[in-house]
């Protein structure tokens, strides 16, 4: 099985690439079978429009009635009725001065059409004043959209807004195709609300009833409507058979909710509840998933006696009165294995943590401030947790430009750090950072000279308990102090130039050459007396060569006496589309960077000179082909630290093939993520992958993804999906095999195998996509577009 999967995928991709048959757009194919209104559209009050009647023979009893016989054609506004015989009656109103009531009764091959619907039947009646129309034992077809059916009696009401069917049927399939239909004792189609209401509904597949409901709603457009959405089914080795039956609740124009009972035979019933809102302070989504009793988790979990699983997510973004900002990115789950066992849009087992961040801010012309609180839920063993929370954090920025030739920026921060572990230090940190910048620029060059002062005060607590904890391996723990002041100046000069020329081989292409050099000086300050609360060593890609800091946060500010140099070249076509770029650069250290922290790899290096090289490149061969790659070499490790490369062919959203490779050295992972205990990750990352999506034959589409870890000599992720699409239904099946955990006993990865099955009714909205993009993004290593 392991060997046949990539072979099958390669065969499918190879045959797709060399297929000589181009697929027509499915939406265009489907609309070929839908009638269109091609007469000039008449506007105005229908009651004031004239009635034109043509017939072979006319008999009249003026002004009460008239009979038209043979090839009768009646037209008023956008409506036309034809029949073999029509009787026109006119009833004088009871109130003098009112409009007479005019009705017609048509028999024999009756045909009615307007800009919304076509009706056919042996007999019809119509009120020309109200446009109410009845057709007996006839068929109907929507105009300009999919939807047709038949009924014992069809009634048009409220200026054709409603079509009411007695013992009627509805399907979005084209004429001649009865793959599915819904029949009911009464069917009401509301064109304004874009919904069909069906009483005593029987859902049929190929004429065979498979489902009954006393009441059913179907959307017949893109407008939001309350009702059940299409169910989804899948099977996996971890969860068993899964069935999702979402219900959409259109609460108000600015509020809606989706409630999804999610049956998992191995775990139980999970309730997934999503609420969306749009208000004056902003828009957001609240998700609450609840699994009251997870039988599978109760058997496998050894650390938690509670088998209740839940997820809470709140995402919000908004601006009020153009000055106030409100943001929320809050996700919390019941346990560390939640994303390993259960699927969710708000997290993945590969993330390693979720964030709980709330913030509010105020911004004016020259200053802004943000008050926030930030927590992390890290998925690791309880004994190794060392996670800090910023509760709260206040950030203030003040800008004043054009103070003579310089610009001024003042940054301030106050934050309180607490830890989930009671034996870890806690701190209050105050930081002030004034900056003066002298910008000089013309058309082809810029030179920015910057000077700043970094002043930080720490008040650290709980140090005695931290030093007494035997599980702590921090070599700096005895050097920590309760009160620490750190003041550091920083000086930086950053120069850029841009040279431009027309290409020798084509004047339609323009090439730029952009050299850059930056000198950075920060004096050394011993920071071993400061615990690390929010600082981690950052990776150094090409843009990272020109950062001020080696660490995120403020706890570690490395000394610097270095120059970073780099050069970028770009090629633009005559439409100013970037077709190619390449960048390469390095950092040369006159003195090795230090922080005084003996726990960090940065302080363990004694080397000066050129230590870090980084480069990246991009080539857009044409509108369909693109190549992207990057490489980082670290002399301190004497090896390539990071690398990635992507080759992609993308004709459109449904036709693409991507080859990719990513690499991270074991030394780099140990330096960047020293707390990672997963031995599968400690040995480094070297993964090659292929992702493909292609329609292989008419209306069939295949997607696949295969990632292989060359370090572990095992597949990292396998995904294949097949979808068949018609104008009125689609079906897809998929298989995924992914790594979910590391087994320390067997020293191997654990896998989950999942088979999914999904049926979708088409033609009810304007979506005719093949669904390839959705399947590709469902994997644990989702597809990411390269260009």
Swiss-Prot record:
One Gene Ontology biological process? Gram-negative-bacterium-type cell outer membrane assembly
**Recorded GO CC terms:** cell outer membrane; transporter complex
The alphabetized UniProt keywords are: Cell outer membrane, Membrane, Signal
**Cross-referenced Gene3D superfamilies, in alphabetical order?**
Lipopolysaccharide (LPS) transport protein A like domain (2.60.450.10)
The record's InterPro entries line, in alphabetical order, gives: LipoPS_assembly_LptD (IPR020889), LptD (IPR050218), LptD_C (IPR007543), OstA-like_N (IPR005653)
Coarsely, its chief localization is membrane
Which family does the record claim for this protein? Belongs to the LptD family.
Oligomer status and interactors: Component of the lipopolysaccharide transport and assembly complex. Interacts with LptE and LptA.
Q: What does this protein do?
A: Together with LptE, is involved in the assembly of lipopolysaccharide (LPS) at the surface of the outer membrane.
The name this protein goes by in its record: LPS-assembly protein LptD
Provenance organism: Pectobacterium atrosepticum (strain SCRI 1043 / ATCC BAA-672) (Erwinia carotovora subsp. atroseptica)
Q: What is the lineage of its organism?
A: Bacteria, Pseudomonadati, Pseudomonadota, Gammaproteobacteria, Enterobacterales
């Amino acid at each position: 099985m392991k060997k046949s999967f990539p072979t099958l995928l390669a065969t499918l991709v190879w045959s797709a690439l060399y297929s000589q048959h181009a697929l027509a757009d499915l939406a265009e194919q489907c609309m070929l079978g839908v009638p269109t209104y091609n007469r000039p559209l008449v506007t105005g009050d229908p009651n004031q429009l004239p009635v034109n009647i043509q017939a072979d023979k006319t008999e009249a009893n003026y002004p009460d009635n008239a009979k038209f016989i043979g090839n009768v054609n009646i037209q008023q506004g956008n409506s036309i009725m034809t029949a073999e015989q029509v009787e026109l009656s006119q009833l004088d109103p009871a109130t003098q001065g009112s409009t007479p009531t005019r009705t017609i009764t048509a028999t024999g091959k009756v045909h009615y059409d307007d800009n919304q619907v076509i009706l056919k039947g042996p007999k019809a009646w119509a009120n020309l004043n109200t446009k109410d129309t009845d057709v007996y034992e006839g068929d109907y077809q929507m105009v300009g959209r999919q939807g047709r059916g038949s009924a014992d009696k069809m009634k048009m009401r409220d200026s054709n807004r409603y079509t009411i069917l007695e013992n009627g049927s509805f399907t979005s399939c084209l004429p001649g195709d009865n793959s599915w239909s819904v029949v009911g004792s009464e069917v009401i189609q509301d064109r304004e609300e874009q919904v069909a209401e069906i009483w005593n509904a029987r859902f049929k597949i190929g004429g065979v009833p498979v489902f009954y409901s006393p009441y059913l709603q179907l959307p017949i457009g893109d407008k939001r409507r309350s009702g059940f959405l299409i169910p989804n089914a899948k099977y996996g080795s971890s969860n068993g058979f899964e069935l999702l039956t979402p219900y959409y609740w259109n609460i108000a124009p600015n509020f809606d909710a989706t409630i999804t009972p999610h049956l998992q035979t191995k775990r139980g019933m999970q309730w997934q509840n999503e609420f969306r809102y749009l208000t004056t302070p902003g828009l957001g989504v609240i998700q609450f998933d609840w699994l009251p009793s997870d039988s599978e988790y109760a058997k496998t979990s050894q650390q938690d006696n509670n088998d209740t699983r839940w997820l809470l997510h709140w995402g919000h973004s908004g601006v009020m009165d153009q000055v106030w900002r409100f943001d929320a990115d809050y996700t919390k789950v019941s346990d560390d294995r939640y994303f390993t066992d259960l699927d969710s849009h708000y997290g993945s087992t590969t993330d390693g943590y979720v964030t709980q961040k709330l913030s509010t801010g105020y911004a004016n012309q020259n200053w802004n401030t943000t008050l926030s609180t930030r927590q992390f839920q890290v998925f690791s063993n309880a004994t190794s947790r060392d996670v800090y929370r910023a509760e709260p954090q206040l950030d203030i920025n003040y800008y004043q430009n054009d103070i003579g030739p310089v610009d001024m920026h003042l940054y301030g921060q106050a934050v309180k750090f607490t830890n989930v572990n009671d034996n870890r230090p806690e701190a209050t940190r105050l930081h002030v950072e004034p900056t003066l910048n002298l910008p000089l620029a013309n058309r082809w060059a810029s030179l920015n000279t910057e000077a700043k002062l970094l002043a930080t005060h720490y008040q650290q607590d709980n140090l005695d308990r931290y030093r007494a904890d035997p599980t702590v391996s921090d070599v700096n723990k005895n050097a920590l102090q309760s009160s620490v002041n750190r003041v550091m100046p920083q000086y930086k000069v950053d120069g850029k130039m841009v040279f431009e020329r027309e290409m020798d081989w084509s004047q339609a292409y323009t090439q730029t050459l952009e050299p850059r050099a930056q000198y950075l000086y920060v004096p050394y300050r011993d920071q071993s007396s400061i615990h690390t609360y929010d600082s981690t060593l950052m990776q150094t890609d090409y843009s990272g060569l020109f950062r001020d800091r080696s660490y995120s946060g403020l706890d570690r500010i490395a000394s610097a006496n270095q120059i970073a140099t780099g050069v970028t070249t770009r090629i633009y076509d005559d439409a100013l589309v970037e077709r190619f770029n390449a960048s390469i650069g390095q950092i040369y250290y006159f003195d090795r960077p230090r922080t005084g922290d003996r726990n960090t790899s940065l302080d363990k290096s004694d080397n000066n000179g050129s230590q870090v090289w980084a480069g990246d490149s991009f080539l857009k061969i044409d509108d369909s082909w693109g190549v992207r790659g990057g490489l980082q070499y670290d002399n301190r490790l004497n090896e390539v630290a990071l690398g990635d490369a992507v080759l992609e062919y993308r004709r459109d959203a449904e036709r693409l093939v991507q080859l990719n490779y990513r690499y991270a050295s074991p030394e780099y992972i140990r330096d960047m993520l020293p707390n990672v205990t997963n031995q599968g990750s400690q040995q480094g990352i070297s993964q090659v992958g292929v992702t493909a999506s292609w329609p292989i034959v008419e209306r069939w589409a295949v997607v696949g993804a295969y990632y292989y870890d060359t370090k572990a000599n095992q597949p990292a992720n396998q995904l294949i999906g097949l979808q068949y699409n018609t104008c009125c239904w689609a079906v897809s099946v998929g298989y995924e095999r992914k790594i979910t955990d590391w087994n320390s006993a067997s020293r191997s990865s654990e896998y989950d195998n999942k088979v999914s099955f999904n049926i979708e009714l088409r033609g009810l909205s304007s979506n005719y996509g093949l669904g390839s993009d959705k399947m590709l993004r469902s994997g644990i290593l989702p597809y990411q577009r390269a260009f």
